[in-house]
């Protein structure tokens, strides 16, 4: 009887062809379908970050093991993305392969990317409301909410260059994880291939614009709308988190990180690998 367990992997050129076909297929979907799938992706990312934060909320931030375990927990969000076939902005930038092939123009690519980003934001907003009304912010004597605040505050003090660089490295890992998942022939293969790259980016503190769309606006909401009882339990005050404002988030984090994510995914993975494996020889 043939053993079904196998380490048989797709060849690199085969992976590139698969990635190109997936990119073209994503672009060809209806706008409603793209938006709904992007909403699901936003929810999954928020779920992954909620798992991550629930694990590290009461742990010392200096412990390497805490970062490792937190990173492993965060991979849940990406596993859900891979299994359910949704559209995340940072991985959808790989659809630039379809542009390189000449299937679409830049306008179509840009509209698709913006639609996915808006869908991700809508999904995150829906899940954030559930988290807010669930009372989790007050759990563990408000430690859960305080962890959100400290995590978000720490993301707001990078320089522009640092934020872009962290964004590049983050989406390099995310898109390589996705690329590696194309190697696998089974669900287990795909999941295992994704775990370490995602864990690395989380444990190393790289910046992901869609994850930040969940954690930082939610932390801003806590800072402005949390009841007095929250601050009493936390033995803190809103004044201890001055960087958590909408304008500062957009200029100091969201825009530079998004730029870095686009460079990391579209240029360093999609365009480079297409040039290596699918470029037509003269």
List each model region and its residues.
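Alpha-helical transmembrane segments and their helix-helix packing motifs
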Residues: 1-282
């Amino acid at each position: 009887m043939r053993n079904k367990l196998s380490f048989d992997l797709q060849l690199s050129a085969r992976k590139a062809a698969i990635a190109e076909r997936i990119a073209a297929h994503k672009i060809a979907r209806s706008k409603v379908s793209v938006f709904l799938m992007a909403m699901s992706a936003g929810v999954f990312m928020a779920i992954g970050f909620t798992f991550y934060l629930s694990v590290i909320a009461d742990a010392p931030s200096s412990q390497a093991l805490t970062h490792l375990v937190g990173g492993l927990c965060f991979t849940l969000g990406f596993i859900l993305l891979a299994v359910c076939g949704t559209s995340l902005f940072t991985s959808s930038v790989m659809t630039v392969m379809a542009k390189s092939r000449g299937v679409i123009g830049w306008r179509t690519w840009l509209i698709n990317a913006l639609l996915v980003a808006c869908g991700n934001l809508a999904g995150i907003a829906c899940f954030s409301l559930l988290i807010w009304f669930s009372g989790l912010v007050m759990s563990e004597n408000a430690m859960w909410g305080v962890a959100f605040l400290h995590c978000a505050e720490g993301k707001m003090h990078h320089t522009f260059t640092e934020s872009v660089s962290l964004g590049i490295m983050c989406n390099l890992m995310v898109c390589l994880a996705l690329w590696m998942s194309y190697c696998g022939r089974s669900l287990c293969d795909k999941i295992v291939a994704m775990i370490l790259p995602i864990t690395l980016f989380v444990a190393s503190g790289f910046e992901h614009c869609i994850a930040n769309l969940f954690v930082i606006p939610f932390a801003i909401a806590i800072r402005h709308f949390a009841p007095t009882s929250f601050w009493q339990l936390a033995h803190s005050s809103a004044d201890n988190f001055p960087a958590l404002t909408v304008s500062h988030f957009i200029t100091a984090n969201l825009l530079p990180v998004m730029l870095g994510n686009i460079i990391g995914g579209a240029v360093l993975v999609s365009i480079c690998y297409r040039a290596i494996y699918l470029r037509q020889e003269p």
